[in-house]
């Protein structure tokens, strides 16, 4: 189990990556990270008390799609070891809502990562409790 500090596994993220990690240790924290055959899994816990959930939606918190995308980019940046930004969203499917009250822990699975020039293609699947919440196919560029 990861204590929340990347140094436990692979060393501290560099300063450039830290700059783009807008939601890490705020909206979510990483509880474990593991290498898989197809990429890497990041098990995260969402903070149901985060101010985003006060507005989206009061009494019925739902993780906004834009936050799911940002978390995916942050975790892909960690995976690649460099800061990335979305260049193109090839495909995105939000299959079920993610409520931090009902499902505080989810897994972001980063796979099919291909680096070409200054761009990185990847697929990210968000799942937990036997459910798939979202699937993203992204092309990111180095920041």
Annotate the PLM regions:
Residues 73-111, 119-121, 137:
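Hydrophobic beta-strand-centered segment that forms part of the acyl-chain substrate-binding groove
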Residues 5-8, 14:
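Intrinsic-disorder-associated, low-complexity terminal segments enriched in Asp/Asn/His/Tyr and depleted
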Residues 46, 94, 140-142:
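Hydrophobic residues in beta-strands and at strand termini
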Residues 15-19:
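Charged/polar low-complexity intrinsically disordered segments
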């Amino acid at each position: 189990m990861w204590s929340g500090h990347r140094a436990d596994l692979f060393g501290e993220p560099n300063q450039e990556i830290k700059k783009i990690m807008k939601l890490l240790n705020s909206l979510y924290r990483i509880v474990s990270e593991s290498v898989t055959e197809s990429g890497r899994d990041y098990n995260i816990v969402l903070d149901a008390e985060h101010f985003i959930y006060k507005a989206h939606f009061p009494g019925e918190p739902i993780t906004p799609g834009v936050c799911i995308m940002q978390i995916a980019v942050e975790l892909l940046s960690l995976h690649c070891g460099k800061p990335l930004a979305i260049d193109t969203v090839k495909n995105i499917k939000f299959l079920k809502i993610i409520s931090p009250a009902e499902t505080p822990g989810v897994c972001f699975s980063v796979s099919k990562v291909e680096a070409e020039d200054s761009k990185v293609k990847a697929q990210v699947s968000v799942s937990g409790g036997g459910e798939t919440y979202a699937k993203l196919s992204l092309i990111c560029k180095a920041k």
